[in-house]
């Protein structure tokens, strides 16, 4: 009986091995077929990212137009968007992981494009009735709230699509192929996103400058409505045409069902702490209610994650990077709205944003060269202070009398600083990859993203407090001070690791001056 069982097991293993070999041999589909589905993926992702990047740029212009002398509406929208991402971002990731691909596709594209269409429609109504705020303030407020909520839902839906395509499908489609295939797909997908970030503001700015603001809102709403169907057809074609995605979908459905069964069958834990047994009605003699709550909070996974983060060697670089999110010195909602208020043409703002994105893209080429010569730690130092030096131009623009020149100085300083900013970002990320243990890497990454989103939210809250565009100089000084604090923290970290900051002896001119000033030992 045992021999028969062993023979049956061996036979099953041989069948599985043969099936695996059969699957591995013809894994690569015909080049034309695979190329077609990869192109479908790229085109669908481009359409989705174009909608997201267009709304990201346009919403600031709409808000400053609706409330011309205040950054209040733009700051409120930015705060709602950042807050929703910070709070619901992890939930979106769990939701994407727990559903099958078809449901994720349908919900992602439905909510993203529907919410953007609703937001665009609300903006159109607000722009068509220019005096709605004075004529009917409740309706004006309802449309503003609708725009904010729809925009936040659109951003969360976009996050779901980004996780699905960038973190899942690209990996699944490249399974069984050389690593260069995944590298190429990642590069193309990142290039699509950066191209959308580069070009959509330019196109939108041209429409606003040479047609009208209303035309841009109508174009955006129509684009979101039409492309929803095209995106769904492209992505569902990829899902149906790539067997690896179908097999991955079956595995994730099985994992989801297994987790549900394990959750139902999990044993009920019984507390062994005196005074907490079921049916016990008395109060513990030595522990008050507040102490019990504090004890539970200290043992929660949330507090545990932060404890792990602050115990890392790279906590100072992580905090330094997060502090850079507490700024208005970027082509974000607040600065874009301020430039619009200053009278800078919209297409110029779009071009400036495009130049900024191009400079940031160059950082991915310069960083490997510097890192190979200076090490990751020192590359972070040099890149950070190069960014800080460029931001001095933004600070100097505060004392320039002519508003247009000051605005162009602000844009130039921000655009130039992107090279150092993104190089510093890459340096900190690489330090976390190298120095954080594998068991803590996801926890540290999650806390880092949470900290960055929280500081980004604080920047928008600051914009709500200082909402007059005339007072943007206050936000500029606060942002520059925060950046300076981040630089000091990173410099302290480097000094703590290396016991020095610069190699003065490696600077020939400085070395000669020092030796000329100091007396020789023979003369002493």
UniProtKB/Swiss-Prot annotation:
Cross-referenced Pfam families: FPN1 (PF06963)
Chain segments annotated as transmembrane: 70-92, 109-129, 137-157, 191-211, 218-238, 314-334, 347-367, 380-400, 409-429, 446-466, 472-492
Example GO biological process: cobalt ion transport
Cell compartments where the protein resides: Membrane
Record's GO cellular component terms: plasma membrane
Lipid bilayer topology: Multi-pass membrane protein
Ranges of Basic and acidic residues composition bias in the record: 1-18
GO molecular function, one term: iron ion transmembrane transporter activity
The entry's keywords: Ion transport, Membrane, Transmembrane, Transmembrane helix, Transport
Region (Disordered): 1-30
Cross-referenced InterPro entries: Ferroportin-1, MFS_trans_sf
Family matches, as CDD domains: MFS_SLC40A1_like (cd17480)
Entry-linked PANTHER family: SOLUTE CARRIER FAMILY 40 MEMBER (PTHR11660), SOLUTE CARRIER FAMILY 40 MEMBER 1 (PTHR11660:SF68)
Family assignment from sequence similarity: Belongs to the ferroportin (FP) (TC 2.A.100) family. SLC40A subfamily.
Its job: May be involved in iron transport and iron homeostasis.
Protein name as it appears in the record: Solute carrier family 40 member 1
């Amino acid at each position: 009986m045992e021999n028969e069982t062993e023979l049956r097991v061996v036979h099953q293993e041989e069948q599985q091995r043969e099936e695996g070999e059969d699957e591995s041999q013809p894994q690569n589909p015909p080049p034309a077929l695979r190329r077609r589905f990869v192109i479908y993926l790229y085109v669908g992702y481009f359409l989705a990212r174009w909608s997201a990047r267009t709304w990201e740029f346009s919403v600031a212009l709409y808000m400053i137009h609706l409330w011309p002398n205040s950054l209040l509406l733009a700051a409120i929208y930015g705060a709602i968007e950042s807050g929703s991402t910070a709070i619901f971002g992890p939930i979106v990731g769990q939701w994407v992981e727990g559903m099958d691909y078809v449901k994720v596709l349908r919900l992602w594209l439905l909510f993203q494009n529907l919410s953007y269409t609703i937001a665009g429609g609300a903006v159109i109504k607000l722009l068509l009735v220019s005096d709605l705020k004075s004529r009917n303030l409740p309706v004006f407020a309802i449309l503003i709230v609708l725009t904010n909520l729809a925009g936040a839902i659109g951003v969360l839906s976009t996050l779901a699509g980004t996780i699905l395509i960038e973190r899942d499908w690209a990996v699944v489609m490249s399974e069984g192929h050389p690593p260069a295939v995944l590298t190429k797909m990642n590069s193309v997908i990142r290039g699509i996103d950066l191209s959308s970030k580069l070009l959509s503001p330019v196109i939108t700015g041209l429409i606003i400058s040479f047609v009208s603001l209303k035309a841009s809102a109508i174009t955006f709403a129509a684009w979101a409505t039409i492309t929803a169907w095209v995106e769904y057809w492209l992505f569902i074609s990829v899902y149906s045409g790539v067997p690896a995605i179908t097999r991955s979908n079956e595995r994730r459905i099985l994992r989801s069902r297994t987790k549900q069964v394990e959750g139902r069958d999990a044993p009920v834990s019984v507390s062994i702490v005196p005074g907490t047994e079921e049916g016990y009605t008395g109060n513990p003699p030595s522990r008050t209610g507040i102490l019990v709550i504090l004890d539970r909070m200290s043992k929660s996974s949330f507090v545990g994650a932060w404890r792990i983060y602050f115990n890392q060697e790279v906590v100072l670089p992580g905090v330094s990077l997060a502090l850079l999110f507490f700024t208005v010195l970027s082509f974000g909602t607040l600065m874009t709205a301020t430039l619009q208020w200053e009278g800078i043409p919209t297409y110029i703002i779009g071009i400036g944003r495009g130049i900024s994105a191009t400079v940031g893209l160059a950082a991915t080429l310069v960083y490997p060269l510097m890192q190979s010569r200076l090490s990751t730690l020192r590359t972070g130092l040099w890149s950070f202070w190069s960014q800080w030096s460029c931001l001095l131009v933004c600070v100097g623009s505060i004392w320039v009398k002519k508003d247009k020149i000051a605005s162009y100085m602000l844009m130039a300083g921000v655009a130039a600083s992107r090279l150092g900013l993104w190089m510093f970002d890459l340096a900190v990320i690489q330090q976390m990859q190298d120095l954080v243990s594998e068991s803590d890497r996801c926890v540290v990454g999650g806390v880092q993203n949470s900290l960055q989103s929280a500081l980004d939210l604080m920047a928008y809250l600051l914009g709500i407090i200082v909402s007059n565009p005339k007072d943007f100089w206050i936000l500029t000084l606060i942002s520059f001070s925060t950046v300076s604090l981040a630089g000091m923290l990173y410099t302290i970290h480097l000094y703590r690791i290396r016991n020095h900051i610069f190699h003065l002896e490696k600077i020939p001119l400085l070395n000669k001056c020092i030796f000329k000033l100091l007396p020789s030992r023979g003369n002493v």
